[in-house]
Design a protein with these regions (language model features):
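Structural alpha/beta surface segment adjacent to cysteine/selenocysteine redox centers
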Residues: 19-122
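Local sequence-structure signature of Cys/Sec-based thiol-disulfide redox active-site neighborhoods
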Residues: 2-25
Length: 125
């Protein structure tokens, strides 16, 4: 029996591109038709004490209009710039992921965190 293809993904729950990439990744895995193991690894984009971004500042609305929203429309993904300000640190959310992964529910947890932040504007910190 062939070894599974292993994919490591470094991701942060406040990165819209990480959420947008989930669908294409799942489709690619189905298309390959091979046994694929996906390992999610935490990568906090702005760890404490570095300040996190604020949606009312110029950068976030600008990048969302130029890149995030067009990509989301192409992929058919419902995503909105969260109003949480400043954006949360995600270290605690990653601790939650570790527990969920140990229970075999890591992928489900990741999807829930992305939905909570990018569709419900919940503070993940």
């Amino acid at each position: 029996m062939a070894e599974p293809v292993k994919i490591k993904i470094w991701s942060d729950y406040v990165c819209p591109f990480c959420m947008l990439a989930e669908g294409p990744l799942e489709e690619a895995i189905k298309d390959v038709g091979a046994d694929v193991e996906v390992e999610w690894l935490p990568f906090e984009l702005r760890p404490h004490p570095q300040p996190t971004l604020r949606p009312e500042d110029e950068y976030l609305p600008s990048i969302w209009e130029r890149a995030v929203y067009p990509m989301a429309r192409r992929l058919g993904v419902d995503i909105t710039l969260p109003t949480v300000s400043p954006q949360p640190y995600t270290a605690l959310a990653f601790e939650g992921y570790q527990y969920a992964a140990e229970q075999g529910r890591g992928a489900e947890y990741n999807q829930r965190m992305f939905r909570a932040f990018f569709q419900e504007s919940q503070d993940l910190g």
